[in-house]
Amino acid sequence: MIYLDNAATSFPKPPQVVRAMSEAIEHYGANPGRGGHQLALQAGRTVEKCREAAAKFLGVPKPERVIFTRNCTESLNLAIVGMLHKGAEVICSHGEHNAVMRPLERYVSRDEITVKLLRPDPHGLLSPDVLRSAITTDTALVIVCHASNVTGVIQPVRELGAVCRERGVPFLVDAAQTAGILDVTLDTLNADLIAMPGHKGLMGPHGTGLLALREGIDPEPLILGGTGSASESVRQPSLLPDRYESGTLNLPGIAGLLAGIEFVAPQREEIHRRETRLNDRLRQQLKEIPGLTILGDELAPRVAITAVVPAGGDSAALADALDATGVAVRGGLHCAPAMHSYLGTMKSGAVRFAPGPFTTERNIDDASALVARLMR
């Protein structure tokens, strides 16, 4: 199987990720932070080592401001729900994932908040000037997807974040497609909150996510319960990270995420360059196939994502045919209907290709040849 669905989750994982998870399960699979015996302490040390590695990688000065979650969706929900109040205004774009749009819709449907959607320019990019004009005294949060789940186009988040800072509005970045690939830190993005999965560019396992918080940004917790601290009180502790990490943490997942971060950190830029070369090769080959439309502006910066629509608009059929011939891609709306509505592809959807760290040129050439054969 040629795996080109790395925008959904990276696969295969580095061998050290598998080993780290196995070791945690086999040798010290106790409950971190829930006991004083040796195994619980060892489990806790692994959790904190991962937190420290993530904090260093993400430019978070205090490791306790890196919060473990199950995925990017949970990180986004924690940030959104925890930062909003009745009467708040939220600004986001047509590029947002349902992990942003559905939480917002719940509160809009209750007449508790209002949402402004910013339209991108012809290149698919958001304008800092347009954002500046959109912000009002009611704006409580600005949310931007760093790179589109559909087209891969990278937004000018640093400039957008500077506008938010200038206007005193918290800025949340959805780094689902960029963490572990681009330089994603609080300072480089001018972000106050960064939500990300552990299982994509960071090369960790499923069921892992992170939320990075700038000092002074303290959303209300999403889940309340046991933290292993302040157990004498029925009130949720204010101590970080305990405030946000109720319940048993995913020790095997966090052990694997630590190994993933250690794999990515020293070679992030090279991984990005290599994935970009492979994606450029793929786009060039797909452009030569009659009957395919490639989504997204050619001149816009992008991560290694390419989405196409076949003539006739049956993206699901093309994705299924590729699967039957040994190529794993994703067809449909990619949980981003607002973007497809903007692109005019709500009915057709698209077929998304996303090379990863272990993709080869041969994989790209073979996949393109199969697409060409299927489009005849």
What are these regions (language model features)?
Residues 1-376:
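Pyridoxal 5′-phosphate
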